[in-house]
UniProtKB/Swiss-Prot annotation:
GO terms for cellular component: extracellular space. InterPro entries: 4_helix_cytokine-like_core, Somatotropin/Prolactin, Somatotropin_CS. It is found in: Secreted. The keyword Oxidoreductase does not apply. Pituitary gland. The keyword Isomerase does not apply. Disulfide bonds join C69-C183, C200-C210. Residues 1-23 form the signal peptide. The gene is prl. The lineage of its organism: Eukaryota, Metazoa, Chordata, Craniata, Vertebrata. This is Prolactin. Its main location: secreted.
Amino acid sequence: MARRSQGTKLHLAVLCLVVSCHAIGLSDLMERASQRSDKLHSLSTSLTKDLDSHFPPMGRVMMPRPSMCHTSSLQTPKDKEQALRVSENELISLARSLLLAWNDPLLLLSSEAPTLPHPSNGDISSKIRELQDYSKSLGDGLDILVNKMGPSSQYISSIPFKGGDLGNDKTSRLINFHFLMSCFRRDSHKIDSFLKVLRCRATKMRPETC
């Protein structure tokens, strides 16, 4: 009976959260999404620095080029100037497509982090879990956003991830782990940039000043 009561309370809490989110204005939702994307990018930058502290000397030479990131097939604005010329619907679609494309890679990184041949693998593992939490939270927030923006903003590009193995030897695992994190850091910067442009538009600020 107690378990049923707890389940009912949890259901009501989630229901109230959803209802309150839908009652919030578009500019406030944009602000919250921007804060989460900023944290996501900050965490990915911190993780990249952690990995840099114990990287094989030949790692930079052996690491794949950025063009090999699995999300490189998605055409996105190259800089802020280009992003300012893209519509709201397309920017939110690009942000959601990039975020969704990292669900499986983050699962792989999460499973590999605890045994990564790196002296800070415990901290790295903890930060990867944080990335997953923030990614999930941001994704949920963007889902609410697009429901407010209308059907034309709901398109998502499917970007498959085919790399399910980081390798067997220590060097390969470190290099491939670092490569995936560098790709995620690049994409988290794009997501953050797109959402900041959208936030400025929603608050009627001049986007070029953001």
